[in-house]
């Protein structure tokens, strides 16, 4: 009888140890997706040939309303910082995926996305959005008249909300770039008029 009890305890111990090992593997996989993947300085060095200027776009009510619609949340900030060299701009967004923020940076040139990077990923799932093969889909995307992307971005199983977050950030970057370029044209026209 003791031998039967002893073997039963042995089976239960092995089952318990296996459970802990599997739990550890799942936890490590989850934690492996969380982390800092690129610094802002590194991103700017990658997308600009010369050191970009840090600039500020002051947001009026109309721009804030547009951003609120695009980002699907109330955007209450009065200004947004961006980086610029010539016609190229870079924008950083800190948007919620499923539960936690995803810090992403998007470079735009000539009204097209030229680079997307995940600076910091804090979600426990959906980390595949940081992969180059996924982010490359955004390159050359432009903004339609209805503020949508001109390219279809393929989703990732288990990362639906992270993908939507990056889509919204990409649209916001394109819209903000468009606003900055329009402001430049208006300022240049005013300068030309005042010179006459």
Where are these regions (language model features)?
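Compositionally biased, low-complexity segments
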Residues: 2-3, 15, 64
């Amino acid at each position: 009888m003791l031998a039967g009890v002893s073997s039963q305890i042995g089976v239960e111990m092995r089952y318990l140890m296996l459970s802990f090992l599997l739990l550890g593997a799942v936890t490590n996989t989850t934690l492996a997706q969380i982390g800092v993947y690129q610094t802002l300085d590194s991103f700017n060095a990658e997308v600009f040939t010369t050191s970009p200027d840090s600039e500020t776009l002051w947001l009026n009510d109309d721009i804030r309303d547009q951003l609120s619609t695009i980002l699907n949340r109330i955007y209450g900030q009065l200004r947004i910082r961006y980086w610029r060299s010539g016609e190229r701009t870079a924008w950083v967004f800190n948007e919620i995926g499923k539960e936690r923020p995803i810090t992403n940076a998007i470079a735009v040139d000539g009204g097209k996305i030229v680079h997307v990077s995940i600076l910091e990923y804090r979600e426990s799932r959906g980390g595949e959005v940081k992969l180059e093969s996924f982010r490359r889909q955004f390159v050359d995307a432009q903004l339609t008249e209805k503020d949508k992307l001109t390219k279809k971005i393929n989703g990732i199983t288990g990362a639906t909300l992270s993908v939507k977050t990056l889509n919204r950030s990409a649209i916001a970057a394109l819209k903000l770039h468009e606003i900055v370029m329009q402001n430049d044209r208006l300022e240049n026209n005013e300068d030309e008029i005042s010179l006459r």
